[in-house]
């Protein structure tokens, strides 16, 4: 069985190449990119300006990740919110949303678990399970944006895991939100 490509982890140029390989015009990539990274939809079904047939083809060929909130805790002191998100494989990661005068910051996870072994950190207790994909990192930001109704202005990669141990994927994640500004 072929593994489906993770469509949200593709940049715009890669998405154009994928669309052309499916016999679609290059503009289709921009439409999909906007649905995923600007409108923040949770599935192909929400991409209503794309034909039902094309959306079905996409479902067959591509994985469309989406994190689901398991628990949300809010500080009574400053309104900071801590999110526990379930990934598509059942693993969970934490993210935090913080409001400041200069804007809203989110702290996201880059791994499930951690291999660093820091004595002060609970993330390392079970070791490293796996790196998050760029789309799973983006999904944390997108879910928080949808759940709070607020725009995110700053992203910190300091949740579960060591971002430098997932460096290449973290760089991909960091570049995507800046493209959609």
Feature names for model-found ranges:
Residues 158-161:
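Glycine-rich beta-strand-to-loop/alpha-helix junction loops that act as flexible
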Residues 172-181:
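Single conserved hydrophobic/aromatic residue that forms the stacking wall/gate
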Residues 99-136:
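Canonical Radical SAM [4Fe-4S] cluster-binding loop centered on the CxxxCxxC motif
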Residues 1-104:
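Flexible, acidic/Gly-rich N-terminal and inter-domain linker regions that tether
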Residues 165:
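Hydrophobic/aromatic residue at the end of a short beta strand that borders the catalytic acidic motif
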Residues 124-154:
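Conserved alpha-helical substructure of the radical SAM core
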Residues 32, 114, 155:
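Residue-level signal for inorganic ion chemistry
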